[in-house]
């Protein structure tokens, strides 16, 4: 089995876990922080914009069962790629949309996919999701891991605006 890693930021990490976890070939999805300048950041620090980190998910996958390309395509359907200042009700640089790439192949796939999305005409505004080189990923505190399973009512409430937008946008 050949494993690979993908890191995506798309707003609150709670809402990014379930759609990836449900795919065949996904070995793990970890909520965490990346892109900042503080070692071992905490949720409270990131939430208060003290670290420069972005909430993200780290996905370990079996690339013989699922491709990086298919993960990028799924990622687009989980975000508003026209909003650089957060996602849905979550505002600020710690919620900005980013595809973090580990190598030239991931960068090529992400950039081509972004260009295809822009050319598709699905969005009236430009696609502003960043594509950046991966930095150290710090797993979030345990209570954030698998949040949608541990707290289904809180998860449903916190993700409602996101789900409403995505259903409307991607069912065109």
Swiss-Prot record:
Keyword field contains Chloroplast: no
Record-annotated active site: 12
Listed EC numbers: 1.8.4.11
Q: Which UniProt keywords apply?
A: Oxidoreductase
What is the catalytic activity of this protein?
L-methionyl-[protein] + [thioredoxin]-disulfide + H2O = L-methionyl-(S)-S-oxide-[protein] + [thioredoxin]-dithiol; [thioredoxin]-disulfide + L-methionine + H2O = L-methionine (S)-S-oxide + [thioredoxin]-dithiol
Main EC class of this protein?
Answer: oxidoreductase
Query: A GO molecular-function term, please?
Result: L-methionine:thioredoxin-disulfide S-oxidoreductase activity
Locate the transmembrane regions by residue number. none
Pfam families named among the record's database cross-references: PMSR
Give the GO terms filed under biological process for this record.
protein modification process
User: Could you tell me what this protein does?
Assistant: Has an important function as a repair enzyme for proteins that have been inactivated by oxidation. Catalyzes the reversible oxidation-reduction of methionine sulfoxide in proteins to methionine.
Q: Record's family?
A: Belongs to the MsrA Met sulfoxide reductase family.
Q: What is this protein called?
A: Peptide methionine sulfoxide reductase MsrA 2
Gene for this chain: msrA2
